[in-house]
Amino acid sequence: MQAATETIAAIATAPGRGGVGIVRVSGPLAGRIAVEVSGRELKPRHAHYGPFLDGGGQVIDEGLSLYFPGPNSFTGEDVLELQGHGGPVVLDLLVQRCLELGARQARPGEFSERAFLNDKLDLAQAEAIADLIEASSEQAARNALRSLQGEFSRRVHALTEQLISLRIYVEAAIDFPEEEIDFLADGHVLGLLEKVRTELSTVRREASQGALLRDGMTVVIAGRPNAGKSSLLNALAGREAAIVTDIAGTTRDVLREHIHIDGMPLHVVDTAGLRDTEDHVEKIGVERALKAIGEADRVLLVVDATAPEAADPFSLWPEFLDQRPEPGKVTLIRNKADLSTEAIGLEESADGHVTITLSARTNAGLELLREHLKACMGFEQTAESGFSARRRHLEALRLAGNALEHGHAQLIHNGAGELLAEDLRQAQQHLGEITGAFTPDDLLGRIFSSFCIGK
């Protein structure tokens, strides 16, 4: 445990007025501040009701005082919580009193940072505190809570332990060549490597869902001109966010709209119609559309169900096939069902392709699309599954996966145990960045500075 030399104080509740407001203090002076502010010795881990006093003995407010001697506290240090009325003036006066007694104003996230430095929680758990506070849906809150309780960290630690076991075996074989262990003939190394690769792939998939729930999914609406893309955007947004006319090429640029479906964030992008054009401005719009398609989490390929070309929608624009994400991230939308004889509905092919027939003009079938998008974001996860994750976690998992893939290739094609050992070391280091076992100080500063003051 790292002993802090400074005592910090801050308001721990949200800005504004409320029934209850909390001032939090952490550090070696917390016990003395507790006595000075409450006017008496506090029994550890008990709530004491009474006045909060200023330097002249005048009452600032009345409320509960709770003192938690370290290391049995959130930060691992001596901690004091003053729970009074939630007026900003009263809370500011309490903080000023703590500063007069030797504390300093806490930086954003400094309480959580001290908890991390004192091994009360790891970095993924610390980030989950902020994710839980900022959760915009029940499922996102559940996932953040599971990460705070250590679910994500346990999965990462399990992977790390498997890597350590594998490294011990491989490096022992390298250090004692007289044993003449044949990595390929032995089969033990390959078996362990396959096991950790499979588990890492599962964790990456679940982490990706967790990141979508936290950050929101980027959905790009693409298709030919006049397929009803802007009408679909307006239907999802519930307002006239885009201009809709019968003139082909009305949308010439990328239009972004942020919406929520049952509290889940969605970043919807309307794009220019995909076609060959001599119009310079429209060409730029098409280029931007293709770029947006390549960056999307989900692409809604909209086709006019009444058009003859709708029979083979993926042949409408060959460049779309080059720019789109993997096939599983494309949903075909057969629009204008109110003008065709097609029934409203959702169909999923044997290879996993989803087609939704709807009418953006009448909103028929729109609820099917909403439910489909919720499922794509992991909304159907149960309370017992899933965890919160961030983009940096996904990058660390990706790099760890790349290292394992490279090590596997070296082992299969070259039987190179030395190179495999280095790849395993790199994979372990990337996983350590998630929990903070291997994390640069500048990254820690960026992470905790994004927290609320008082957290």
From Swiss-Prot:
Keywords: Cytoplasm, GTP-binding, Hydrolase, Magnesium, Metal-binding, Nucleotide-binding, Potassium, tRNA processing. (6S)-5-formyl-5,6,7,8-tetrahydrofolate binds at residues 24, 81, 120, 455. GTP binds at residues 226-231, 245-251, 270-273, 335-338, 359-361. It comes from the Bacteria. CDD domains: trmE, TrmE_N. PROSITE patterns: G_TRME. Mg(2+) binds at residues 230, 251. GO terms for molecular function: GTP binding; GTPase activity; metal ion binding. Exhibits a very high intrinsic GTPase hydrolysis rate. Involved in the addition of a carboxymethylaminomethyl (cmnm) group at the wobble position (U34) of certain tRNAs, forming tRNA-cmnm(5)s(2)U34. NCBIfam families: mnmE_trmE_thdF (TIGR00450), PRK05291.1-3 (NF003661), small_GTP (TIGR00231). This is tRNA modification GTPase MnmE. The lineage of its organism: Bacteria, Pseudomonadati, Pseudomonadota, Gammaproteobacteria, Pseudomonadales. The gene is mnmE.
